[in-house]
């Protein structure tokens, strides 16, 4: 006999705001990777656009491979004390450090700079995926009510737009004031305390998940290959 779904109480607006705070630094990190990195490393650092394009492609392929693994491991930890937020809390300082390394590279030769760029891109993508996958999965578990889920996504994406605006405006403003190299370094330095504070507030103040999903079976790893059958 199947039980009817339980209608969850309306989630507090303040709790939704707390959950959505982490989407601001996530958006602040995502936009510069695609928009600012090519220009910064080509115009300021002196790496060829051909090399940058190849490195970005390689990093994206790596990201596509690791994302299902990170999702699988996130599922394995969701029933622990801190649940998925273990990954969110671990990814935040890693992403902060990687953004600083990406936009404040040391003085290196051209060949070593390419290795530095690919290393920073891999760390940025890994940290970003650690955060985003578990963060968005947590949001889906706050409620099973369609209306409440719409509120969760609306708050999260609305706050994400704030991050997009900051990511688009701050590097340009800082670069015009201090020069491109110093401007991007300052942007990365601002990003560090910002993401740590926002993620801490999200982890501590977010609404508790209401959906209890069955424990992942040992054979669940093979389920990641199921979407490939549709190709």
Protein language model features and the residues they cover:
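Membrane-embedded alpha-helical bundles of multi-pass transporters/translocases
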Residues: 2-231
